[in-house]
């Protein structure tokens, strides 16, 4: 997955007047692969935000996370798939906008990739799903539409559009 457009985020005058570099997309994908906690923001029907930390993995250009369909965030995603994700750091920033939806039962090949990625990242935290973990549901996929990233707010804020 590669962005179709790379530009600058829009800021009010005086915020970031002379950025001198860009964040490479490879840096963003590295952060997506290595980050342990992703902050998922969905919305209630009345527009109030609902934010929750999620464990997630970045596989084949998409972000996958899992959980019960009965959780509040899962119900919100079904009601309104437009969500944001923010990675752990407030300094090395990656903010994503896109859509999330139930992924359904993954193919055997994809399930194997997902299980391996989860095991590599979260076994030390007590979570190591097997490939059949999502046969009955509980897997969600986030598709990136826009990303904003920076490693230094004043010099390299970068916007990626897909």
Language-model-derived ranges and their functions:
Residues 35-69, 75-77, 83-87, 95-97:
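Short beta-strand segments
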Residues 28-29, 74, 115:
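Short amphipathic alpha-helical segments and helix-helix/interface helices
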Residues 12-39:
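Short, basic/aromatic recognition patches
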């Amino acid at each position: 997955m590669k962005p179709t457009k790379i530009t600058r985020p829009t800021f009010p005058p005086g915020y970031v007047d002379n950025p001198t570099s860009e964040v490479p997309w490879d840096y963003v994908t590295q952060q997506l692969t290595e980050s342990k906690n992703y902050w998922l923001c969905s919305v209630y029907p009345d527009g109030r935000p609902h934010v929750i930390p999620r464990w997630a993995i970045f596989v084949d250009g998409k972000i996958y996370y899992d959980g019960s369909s009965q959780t509040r965030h899962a119900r919100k995603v079904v009601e309104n798939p437009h969500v944001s994700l923010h990675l752990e750091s407030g300094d090395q920033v990656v903010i994503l906008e896109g859509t999330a939806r139930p992924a359904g039962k993954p193919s055997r090949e994809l399930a194997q990739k997902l299980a391996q990625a989860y095991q590599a990242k979260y076994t030390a935290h007590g979570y190591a799903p097997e490939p059949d973990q999502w046969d009955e549901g509980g897997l969600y996929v986030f598709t990136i539409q826009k990303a904003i990233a920076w490693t230094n707010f004043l010099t390299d804020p970068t916007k990626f559009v897909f």
